């Protein structure tokens, strides 16, 4: 294997040759597939004598022609990664024809062209197209494509590719063909092909200009009934994008295909979106509310890419957040408008804190726009996506809805059908609004989560209230020193009755800004600065970073009393939730310290009262209450410790949950009883909120291990009319080891063994369990007939799930580490992308005590010494060891 090579943003150069048109032809076969490409090539500089270097991986080259002339072996250079054509016609353009042979049935990496459950399918982003044919596999090569697909008519009755269907027909030998043409220029990562035995759910959407678009969702016949929600979601997304951003669909056909073997969640290929089945298929009996919500969001996300990603794409892969950060922001807004904005915001911020903050503090920390990579697949991360979305959200916070829309409009006006950079998006936002963004671009170039400290003071004589901010970004690999960045802080001030004070003016840096309203945006751009509010009649309680206005960690001088006050009164619902979370984190950290010193644990009664009053506040959204009474996760608490202690944190969280359940059991029982329903399942916010609150209360009660509550949960399991309620009852019961748990897990499997998506949930529930010694159960499940190491969803459920139980993954004897190490080496031979996702669980090994460090390090070293290690796994393992 060649030594892994690091690619750097600073080394970007324009291509020497552009491709204008690409005509592809596929002859699909059982043993081999022949791919022919005919490309119109033009030099960037006329008369250029530069060599044309094409990427290619795992391809058998059959022939190369230039302007119809067959090249001999001495006319080109071929190695394991490239086809180089050194001497080319110097005229304005020429035609290049290449024939290759590939073997999709042997392709377990699931990138390029592969077989999934008997069907042909593609995944080309980021660099999978080079596994199909020799090509300049980079996103700034945008061309117009046609694609002719031919295959056996019985085995592959449906032949799909991008764009519009031009012609189709039968050919000899029981075969048939379809010819597709995409009128829009696109990079090769958006190419797609699907062939197989599929049926479609059909519908139409009439765009605002009156064009009728044919919509088709393709699945195997038995799954067709489960596509109704996906079609609803697609039509809702199309309407929303027109209403909110003025963006209309640009072709006459939109296809979605669901496949069971898929590395990612879904892929936005032009007019032929390919989805992981779990993000398309749903019925009340086989999918939970969380699945329905995920399908809505991801179908929105991939559809929104038609403009933010496809019509305007990335110049190079370092700019990935240009399309992904923006499109995640758009799907978050869409889901917020379809449900509860506050609850969606809480869910998104929780995800950021649980997954992205740790990444930003570990060996894989990288900016929203990375400076370098060995394997681009490793940078489809929570930093690029979720932190990237927060960066886009800050533009909207600063510019307002109308200003943000003006920026988006200018972005498309300037860059339609171009491959551009993060600076181009920044410039459109700035120029459309004549805005001063100071040092905002630092968000794209600096890794690490800023830590903002806030100190307040009140001057009763002058009736002024001051907020002093200081910001610091911790060092990250390759970035020891940081510059201050632009942090928008949305602030409100509460009076002693809990009402927002109307603000009149704020003094900052020698200027006075007049404001009117109950909240304002402070622009923090320096290492230290002060803002002084005037005409404040009494000492207020500040509500800071309303709506989580910047992706930062915040340290304030708010007392516990202030936090209880905000929990009870803040008009910003996000900050009500946040006050409860800050209190819970403080409380749990103190208890961890007590536990480590063998002191008895006791719960602050004020905390119980605070949550109790939220629980009984009928004016609050039920899903908000469910979120507000959910404790911070073990990972969040460990993140705040100098040396993470999984055993202590697990014991403390379990103690707090049981204490809350015990003290609030009457209220919790009432909630379960009052929020049951025997009516048919409806996916809407009020029903989802009702189920979320009921099931959160049920989980609390079942944690008490009281026979009466176990019976209650068992009854909920048996009486449930949908999977949301049934699975929540199953999860509540399986918290506690014993015969009841074993029996009910067996019952659930027997009921759903023929539905692979439900079985994956069954795997996940067992793998994430905190019951003692769970690694042995998970090892047994590897041999379960329903498990398959070649299927990414099953790996994410069983192995990824196990890594999500800190107490078992970080078991003191190293059994969790050894289990994962062995699996990663096996997986890497099959699917390097999935293997590198799994090895990431080791990345923060230095956060733990010396014994655990030694055990984890040994596994990383074992992985690094494996023969034929992929670049994907090498990059994560080597960076983790070097930390």
From Swiss-Prot:
Residues that, per the record, bind Zn(2+): 301, 305, 324
Phenotype when the gene is knocked out: Reduced fertility and shorter siliques bearing a lower number of seeds compared with wild-type plants. Cytogenetic characterization of meiosis in the mutant line reveals that both male and female meiosis are defective.
Entry keywords, A to Z: Aminopeptidase, Hydrolase, Metal-binding, Metalloprotease, Protease, Zinc
Enzyme Commission number(s): 3.4.11.14
Positions of substrate binding: 125, 265-269
Cofactor-binding details, from the entry: Binds 1 zinc ion per subunit.
CDD domains given in the database record: M1_APN
Pfam families assigned to the protein according to its UniProt record, in alphabetical order: DUF3458, DUF3458_C, Peptidase_M1, Peptidase_M1_N
Reactions the enzyme catalyzes: Release of an N-terminal amino acid, preferentially alanine, from a wide range of peptides, amides and arylamides
Keyword Protease: yes
Keyword ATP-binding on entry: no
Protein's recorded name: Puromycin-sensitive aminopeptidase
Record family assignment: Belongs to the peptidase M1 family.
Record organism: Arabidopsis thaliana
């Amino acid at each position: 294997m060649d030594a892994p090579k690091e690619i750097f943003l600073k080394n970007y150069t324009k291509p020497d040759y552009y491709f204008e048109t690409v005509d592809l032809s596929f002859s699909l076969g059982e043993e081999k597939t022949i791919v022919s490409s005919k490309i119109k090539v033009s030099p960037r500089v006329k008369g250029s004598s530069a060599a044309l270097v094409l990427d290619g991986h795992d391809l058998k080259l059959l022939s190369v022609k230039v302007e119809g002339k067959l090249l001999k072996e001495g006319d080109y250079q071929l190695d394991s990664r490239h086809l180089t054509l050194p001497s080319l016609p110097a005229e304005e353009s020429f035609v290049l024809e290449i024939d290759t042979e590939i073997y999709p049935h042997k392709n377990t990496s699931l990138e390029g062209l592969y077989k999934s459950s008997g069907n042909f399918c593609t995944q080309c982003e980021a660099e999978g197209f080079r596994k199909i044919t020799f090509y300049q596999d980079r996103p700034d090569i945008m061309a117009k494509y046609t694609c002719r697909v031919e295959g056996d008519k019985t085995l592959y009755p449906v032949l799909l590719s991008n764009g519009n269907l031009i012609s189709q027909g039968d050919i000899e030998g029981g075969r048939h063909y379809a010819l597709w043409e995409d009128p829009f220029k696109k990079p090769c990562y958006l190419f797609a092909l699907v062939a197989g035995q599929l049926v479609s759910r059909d519908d139409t959407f009439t765009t605002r200009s009156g064009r009728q678009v044919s919509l088709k969702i393709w699945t195997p016949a038995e799954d067709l009934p489960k596509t109704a929600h996906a079609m609803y979601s697609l039509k809702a997304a199309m309407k929303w994008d027109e209403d909110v951003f003025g963006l209309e669909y640009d072709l006459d056909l939109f296809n979605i295909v669901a496949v069971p073997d898929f590395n990612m969640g879904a892929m936005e290929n032009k007019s032929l979106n390919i989805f992981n089945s779990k993000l398309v298929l749903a019925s009340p009996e086989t999918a939970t509310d969380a699945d329905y919500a995920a399908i809505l969001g991801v179908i929105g996300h991939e559809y929104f890419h038609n403009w933010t990603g496809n019509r305007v794409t990335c110049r190079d892969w370092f700019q990935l957040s240009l399309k992904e950060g923006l499109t995640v922001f758009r799907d978050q807004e869409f889901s917020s408008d379809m449900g509860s904005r506050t609850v969606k915001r809480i869910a998104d911020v929780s995800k950021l804190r649980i997954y992205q903050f740790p990444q930003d503090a570990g060996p894989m920390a990288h900016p929203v726009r990375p400076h370098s990579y060995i394997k681009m697949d490793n940078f489809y991360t929570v930093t690029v996506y979720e932190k990237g979305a927060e960066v886009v959200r800050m533009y909207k916070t600063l510019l307002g809805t109308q200003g943000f829309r003006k920026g988006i409009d200018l972005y498309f006006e300037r860059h339609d059908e171009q491959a551009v950079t993060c600076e181009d998006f920044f410039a459109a936002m700035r120029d459309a609004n004549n805005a001063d963004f100071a040092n905002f671009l630092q968000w794209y170039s600096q890794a690490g989560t800023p830590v903002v400290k806030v100190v307040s003071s009140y001057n009763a004589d002058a009736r002024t209230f001051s907020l002093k901010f200081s910001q610091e970004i911790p060092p990250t690999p390759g970035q020891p020193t940081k510059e201050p960045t632009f942090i928008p802080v949305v602030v409100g001030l509460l009076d002693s009755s809990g009402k927002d004070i109307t603000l009149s003016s704020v003094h900052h840096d020698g200027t006075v800004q007049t404001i009117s309203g109950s909240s304002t945006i402070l622009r923090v751009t320096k290492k230290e600065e002060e803002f002084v509010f005037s005409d404040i009649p009494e000492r207020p309680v500040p509500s800071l970073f309303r709506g989580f206005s910047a992706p930062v960690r915040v340290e304030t001088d708010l007392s516990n009393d202030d936090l209880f006050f905000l929990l009870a009164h803040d008009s910003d619902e996000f900050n009500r939730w946040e006050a409860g979370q800050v209190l819970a984190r403080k409380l749990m950290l103190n208890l961890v310290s007590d536990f480590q010193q063998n002191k008895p644990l006791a719960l602050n009664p004020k905390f119980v009262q605070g949550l109790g009053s939220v629980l009984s506040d009928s004016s609050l959204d039920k899903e908000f209450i469910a979120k507000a009474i959910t404790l911070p996760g073990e990972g969040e608490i460990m993140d705040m410790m100098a040396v993470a202690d999984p055993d202590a944190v697990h014991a403390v969280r379990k103690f707090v949950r049981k204490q809350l359940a015990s003290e609030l059991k009457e209220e919790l029982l009432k909630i379960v009883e009052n929020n049951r329903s025997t009516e048919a399942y409806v996916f809407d916010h009020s029903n989802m909120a009702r189920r979320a609150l009921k099931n959160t209360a049920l989980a609390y009660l079942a944690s008490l291990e009281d026979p009466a509550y176990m019976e209650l949960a068992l009854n909920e399991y048996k009486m449930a009319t949908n999977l949301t309620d049934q699975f929540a009852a199953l999860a509540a019961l399986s918290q506690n080891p014993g015969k009841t748990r074993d029996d009910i897990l067996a019952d659930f499997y027997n009921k759903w063994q023929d539905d692979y998506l439900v079985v994956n949930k069954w795997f996940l529930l067992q793998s994430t369990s905190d019951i003692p010694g769970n690694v042995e159960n998970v090892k047994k499940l590897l041999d379960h007939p329903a498990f398959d190491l070649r299927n990414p969803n099953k790996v994410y459920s069983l192995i990824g799930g196990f890594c999500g139980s800190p107490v078992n993954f970080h078991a003191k004897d190293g059994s969790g580490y050894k289990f994962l190490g062995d699996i990663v080496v096996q997986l890497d031979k099959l699917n390097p992308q999935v293997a590198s996702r799994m090895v990431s669980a080791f990345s923060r090994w230095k956060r733990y005590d010396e014994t655990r460090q030694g055990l984890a390090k040994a596994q990383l070293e074992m992985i690094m010494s494996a023969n034929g290690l992929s670049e994907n796994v090498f990059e994560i393992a080597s960076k983790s060891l070097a930390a």
